[in-house]
Amino acid sequence: MEEISLMNDYLKIKKYYINHDQLVSHRFLCNSKECVMSNECCCKIFDVEISPREMQRIISIMDVISNYCSNLKTGKYYRNVFEEEDQRYTIDKKANEYCVFSYFDKSGDLKCAVHSAALEIHKDPYYYKPFVCSIWPVTFFKDMSKRTFIDLDTESHVPCIKKKAMNEKTIDLELLNIILIIMGKDIVSLRNFFKQHNFPR
């Protein structure tokens, strides 16, 4: 089992430093209708930057994606919805400031066309979706020593991130699964640790 220790507010496992206090004290439950009503939606307030590889993956299923977003196609041609700068690309937004790949389904829920397209062709959505979208509201950065610090975005005031009661001291499974995407599925000790213990805050 991987060695786990607590350093200030951070849980240390290998080269990863997880902001335990932030992640334990908040709950994440995606509710697009609530976010749209509040005008604070991740699909609107953030600019999504992707790598060339991520862009190519999206382009490879653009024919399916365009079934969900008619604005992606002009005649028989697909629009260029990526802005390039220094070998990084930013996904365009619509006139309403939402991501160009966002759409509303029949029930009025805001959805990601990339995610929906991947499911339609029976592929893993997280292979095609931008990495920053897959892990949000969890964020991370690497310092000069190649240590990875994992935090929660608590600054954007998006309504799907809620403060938990003070007596709740376990991390939500939804957030834990996102952390495992960053760390890699082979690191199972973190999942087992949270299942077996109420880790002290």
Q: How would you describe each model-predicted region?
A:
Residues 1-201:
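Short loop/turn segments that flank or connect secondary-structure elements
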